Design a protein with these regions (language model features):
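Glycine/Thr-rich beta-alpha phosphate-binding loop at enzyme active sites
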Residues: 112-125, 158-218, 222, 258-265
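Alpha-helix-loop-beta-strand connector modules within alpha/beta enzyme cores
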Residues: 44, 53-72, 125-147, 193-224, ...
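C-terminal helical cap(s) of enzyme catalytic domains, especially alpha/beta-barrels
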Residues: 25-42, 182-198, 240, 246, ...
């Protein structure tokens, strides 16, 4: 939604990422697929959107939107797929288009944190395949490539992904995506949520995000983006002090977008 991305840049967000793009149009999962819930006493959102997208061909004309590029801030394109070949095909289509544009601050985010392969597994379950895919991306593009992983990944899985990325130039890791929970555990039923479970976002994810940032920073010199559960200046400051290069927000933009200028003000006065 260009209008929302524009408004968030107006209030001071430092960069944006388009939602995940697939090769072909997809409606995603059946509705109802997003609900406000309480988790551990905190406000949260549970979604089972299922990566709705208009497909890469319909997305390409929208990338270079002057309302967004005029801020001259980084713009990310999140890429998904139902197979490795689809990931690469989408990447190649977008890279060919970006090469003819005059805006230079595009980057890629590779969404490996959903079950996006033919056998129903996450791409992160096959690390050799992941490594091969990112190396293929690097052969045709010099842009920054960020790999977005799930907070449900084990510490060992996260560190193995970091090992791969640490040997490929201009890469970073994004911790992370939403956390899978069953719908009935947060008071939902099949009448108000179409799937058995979904991805939880909100402040209750923060402590695990902080823990994983510290884990990565103590083992690898790799750029880290921390996005799970960030909801205040104190969160941002603690993550940056713990080794994150950047922080990202999603649910906060829904619940209290005016935290953005407050966070920026506090950071500028540190």
């Amino acid at each position: 939604d260009v209008s929302s991305l524009f408004q968030w840049q107006l209030v001071g967000i430092g960069g944006i990422t388009y939602k995940t793009v697939l090769k072909m149009p997809s409606e995603g999962n059946l509705r109802p697929r997003i609900q406000e819930v309480r988790h551990n006493g905190d406000y949260a959102i549970l979604n089972s959107l299922g990566l709705p997208t208009k497909g890469v061909a319909n997305f390409l004309p929208l990338i270079n939107n002057k309302k967004l590029t005029k801020f001259n801030r980084p713009i990310g394109v999140s890429i998904g797929g139902n197979s490795s070949s689809e990931y690469f095909s989408v990447f190649k289509d977008i890279e060919s288009h970006l090469n003819i544009l005059d805006f230079s601050q595009f980057f890629y985010e590779i969404n490996i944190s959903c079950p996006n392969t033919d056998d129903g597994k996450c791409l992160s379950d096959d690390l050799e395949n992941l490594k091969h895919l990112i190396l293929k991306f690097r052969e045709i593009s010099s842009r920054v490539i960020i790999v977005k992983v799930s907070p449900d990944s084990t510490d060992q899985e996260v560190l193995k992904i970091c090992e791969i990325l640490s040997n490929i130039s201009k890469t970073a890791i994004n911790i992370g995506n939403t956390k899978y929970v069953k719908a009935d555990s947060v008071g939902l039923t099949n009448k108000n949520f179409s799937k058995e479970g979904g991805g939880l976002s909100g402040s209750s994810l923060y402590e695990n995000t902080l823990r994983i940032v510290k884990l990565i920073a103590s083992n690898y010199n790799l750029p880290i983006i921390a996005t799970g559960g960030v909801s205040s200046y104190e969160n941002v400051k603690e993550l940056l002090d713990s080794g994150a290069l950047l922080t990202g927000m999603a649910t906060l933009l829904v619940t209290d977008p005016f935290q953005i200028p407050l966070i920026n003000y506090s950071l500028s006065n540190d």
